[in-house]
């Protein structure tokens, strides 16, 4: 029973799919995809449930969402282990993901009140009231890299606002999605409020093109996001929120503590095996002896990074990539950069055939004349040496993306200069660029999104404002307009 529609667990009526542990190829979930007919049923269920869910009132909706939080807390060990099994991430990291899922509840409630609450202003003969109403039925498309946390960041604020949801997770992480829906079910969510459709591209197409959805919230690749954007062109009545990737730059300038700089570079480039949308893809280090010393220390540290399966002890820093296909893609990306003149300082290598395990790579692309503006979604960091700060910033901005960027520098003046000129939605100073606060918005510019920041600002795309002029009774004004006699 792989689909959750109208509060019932149903078997998919499409073809068989499975998910595998990318570290060893073991099958950990099997099921069948949702057909277009089942997608229709899920949307119909969400539509039928939506008005009653909205009319239940915010406090009652919040109580159910809080009950879901309690279910996450009660099942956090199982959820963390399942995320680790399906994604290949080490358990220390998946435990933090479940913690973020739990923490999202309070943050979403706070954001709902602050961003989309009700506000009343008195007028001489009445009042002006601002309220917010839900869009209706929204589709949520989840990614594989944070299969719990990222869709959770769309679903929770959508429900608080009064929307109902049809959730289509990544086909690579169906078991995590199944656990999430079991938690919602145990929380007492009314039938039809959240529906789960598992499947691959055809299931996604059926949902994205469904005429009865009022919006779509997507986290994933820029390529897929652009397809969705084209599909929704000419449909201004539907809300589309796109959270996509980036070719993210990290500049190092005048850092005294080189060990700390190395740590932040590694955390920026290689955490989650480089499979975070905010991961550093390009590293800019000054020419000269200080830069040489930093690179030597970085190379040494990269070679010491422990890579292993999600459950090995002691725990590795890097687990598996999501699949063998993804691992091979990174080997191919490295070969492409080498063919263009890049020189590998640390070779990225597939550890074991048939798995997604790879070692981290560092490649010097300073002499590559035309560096591809691609998001290589894995643990491959491109190094560029620069001669002056303006050149580094210019090169950092030479991308169609604009998600995250960072500066490691001792000088506040340098950071202010950088902050004013860099083009990105997340800009960090002396922090890893994979670090972001749930109490702040999360999103980028350019090919990284469509100006619908998520996290604390997710509330904004989950509801629309309703402005009202109100009075308790119909009454004549003290003075009639010229030319009127009543």
From Swiss-Prot:
Residue positions of the active site: 243, 277
Which SUPFAM superfamilies does this entry report, sorted A to Z? Answer: ALDH-like (SSF53720)
Q: Which amino acids does the record list as binding NAD(+)?
A: 220-225
User: What reaction gets catalysed by this protein?
Assistant: N-succinyl-L-glutamate 5-semialdehyde + NAD(+) + H2O = N-succinyl-L-glutamate + NADH + 2 H(+)
User: Per its UniProt record, what Gene3D superfamilies does this chain match?
Assistant: Aldehyde Dehydrogenase, Chain A, domain 1, Aldehyde Dehydrogenase, Chain A, domain 2
InterPro entries per record? Ald_DH/histidinol_DH, Ald_DH_C, Ald_DH_CS_CYS, Ald_DH_CS_GLU, Ald_DH_N, Aldehyde_DH_dom, SuccinylGlu_semiald_DH_AstD
Query: Which UniProt keyword terms apply here?
Result: Arginine metabolism, NAD, Oxidoreductase
Q: Which GO terms describe its biological process?
A: arginine catabolic process to glutamate; arginine catabolic process to succinate
Q: What is its EC number?
A: 1.2.1.71
**An MF annotation (GO) of this entry:** succinylglutamate-semialdehyde dehydrogenase activity
Pathway annotation:
Amino-acid degradation; L-arginine degradation via AST pathway; L-glutamate and succinate from L-arginine: step 4/5
Q: Which family does it belong to?
A: Belongs to the aldehyde dehydrogenase family. AstD subfamily.
In UniProt terms, what function does this protein have?
Answer: Catalyzes the NAD-dependent reduction of succinylglutamate semialdehyde into succinylglutamate.
Q: What is this protein called?
A: N-succinylglutamate 5-semialdehyde dehydrogenase
**What gene name is listed for this protein?**
astD
């Amino acid at each position: 029973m792989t689909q959750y529609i109208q509060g019932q667990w149903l078997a998919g009526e499409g073809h068989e799919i499975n998910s595998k542990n990318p570290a060893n190829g073991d099958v950990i979930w099997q099921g069948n995809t949702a057909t277009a007919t089942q997608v229709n049923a899920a949307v119909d269920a969400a539509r039928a449930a939506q008005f009653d869910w909205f009319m239940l009132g915010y406090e009652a909706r919040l109580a159910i969402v809080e009950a879901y939080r309690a279910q996450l807390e009660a099942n956090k060990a199982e959820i963390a282990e399942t995320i680790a099994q399906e994604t290949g991430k080490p358990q220390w990291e998946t435990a933090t993901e479940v913690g973020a899922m739990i923490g999202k509840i309070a943050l979403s409630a706070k954001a709902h009140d602050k961003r989309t609450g009700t506000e009343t202003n008195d007028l001489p003969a009445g009042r002006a009231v601002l309220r917010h109403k839900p869009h209706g039925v929204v589709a949520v498309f989840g990614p594989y890299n944070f299969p719990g946390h990222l869709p959770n960041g769309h679903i929770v604020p959508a429900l608080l606002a009064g929307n109902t949801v049809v959730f289509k997770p990544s086909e690579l992480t169906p078991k995590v999605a199944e656990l999430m829906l079991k938690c919602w079910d145990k929380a007492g969510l009314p039938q039809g409020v959240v529906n789960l459709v598992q499947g691959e591209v055809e299931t996604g197409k059926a949902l994205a093109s469904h005429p009865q959805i009022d919006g779509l919230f997507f986290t994933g690749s820029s390529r897929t996001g652009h397809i969705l954007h084209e599909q929704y062109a000419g449909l201004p009545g539907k809300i589309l929120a796109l959270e996509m990737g980036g070719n993210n730059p990290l500049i190092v300038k005048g850092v005294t503590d080189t060990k700390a700089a190395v740590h932040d570079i590694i955390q920026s480039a290689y955490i989650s095996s480089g499979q975070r949308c905010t991961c550093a893809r390009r590293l800019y280090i000054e020419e000269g002896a200080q830069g040489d010393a930093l690179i030597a220390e970085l190379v040494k540290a990269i070679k010491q990074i422990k890579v292993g399966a999600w459950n090995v002890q002691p725990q590795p820093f890097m687990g598996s990539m999501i699949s063998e296909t993804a691992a091979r893609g990174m080997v191919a990306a490295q070969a492409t950069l080498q063919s263009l003149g890049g020189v590998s300082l640390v070779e990225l290598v597939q550890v074991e055939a048939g798995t997604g395990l790879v070692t981290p790579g560092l490649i010097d692309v300073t002499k590559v004349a035309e560096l591809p503006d691609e998001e290589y979604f894995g643990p491959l960091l491109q190094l560029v040496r620069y001669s002056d700060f303006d050149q580094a910033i210019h090169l950092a901005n030479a991308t169609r993306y604009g998600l995250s960027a960072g500066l490691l520098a001792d000088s506040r003046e340098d950071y202010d200069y950088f902050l004013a000129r860099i083009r990105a939605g997340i800009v960090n100073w002396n922090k890893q660029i994979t670090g972001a606060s749930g109490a702040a918005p999360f999103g980028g510019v350019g090919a990284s999104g469509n100006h619908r920041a998520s996290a604390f600002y997710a509330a904004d795309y989950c509801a629309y404002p309703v402005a009202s002029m109100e009075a308790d009774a119909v009454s004549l004004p003290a003075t009639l307009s010229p030319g009127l006699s009543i």
